[in-house]
Amino acid sequence: MKKICFVTRHAIVNYGSFLQTYATQKLFEDYGYNAEVLDYVREDEEYHNVTELLLKKSKKWNRNIFTRLIYRIVQWPDHYICGRAFEKERAKYLNLSERITNPVVDANKIPTADIYCTGSDQVWGEIAQDDVDPMYFLSFAPHDAKKIAFSASFGKENYPKERIDKFRELLSGYNYITVREDSAVNIVNKAGYEAIQILDPTMIFGGDRWRKQLLPIHEKGYVLLYQLNANREMDEYAKQFANKAGLKLLRVSVEAHNCMRVGKFKLCLSPFKFLSYIANAEYMITDSFHGTAFAIMFNRQFVEVLPKEKITRNLSVLKQFGLEDRI
């Protein structure tokens, strides 16, 4: 059996990140490959480091000992408790390689494979310090290895010429490129290469298969709010929508401080329990790409509230299914 090793942003405490990684692994197995996830976890994405690293960058919270204490009290449950919970889910469901945190120091841990692949999600966008990470462009793979991209994303649609020039260099070793958004096709074309647009892996995997992963829940008659970006107008809209529909409002999140916002709070559900809440909702209100994707797959009524930034992927999936009226 041939082996494929793929890299994606699987280690973020985020439902979409986990579920698209799981779907990619399963799809490659369907295609007859032994699929392995490169367990590349950047230092700034390790759950036990995130709180302190973000605090160092925050002018608002890094002012004095008291503001730093408040920040740690509020953020630590999100990053540590939910981080550990997601790590257990990854260990249970994903075929992970040895952990790699430094591509130079850990070079001997790079798996041998027949094909190396950049997976889905926002792998080709600016990740830290407003720059891209070469690891997600397969910089770790042998020079003569076969390299592909599977539903990759840049996260946004416009980049300056200097960044396009950098993409031209980073994409030069790929044998085949598929991307998630129509705007990503344009970026790859500007860099001088061909790309084909395909669906996100979660959608290729399909609603029927996801339904087999659902877990029992007891909640009924609710509007589900899945919100990634702070937006008071969205909070108020969700509250009024649920009241008008005569339904209770449930909020799912991996951020404990969201317990102070509208809706009955569900903290850090397992990924498949999260899907169960979407599948059983009367309505869903979301600003999340993957929230939208699963609402479509489970044939749920939903309202899309576009985030202020990085709206390309949300718009793209709505356009693909002719659902722009859900905005």
Question: Language model features by range: what are they?
Answer:
Residues 277-317:
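A donor-sugar binding/catalytic signature common to diverse glycosyltransferases
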Residues 320-327:
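Leloir-type glycosyltransferase catalytic cores
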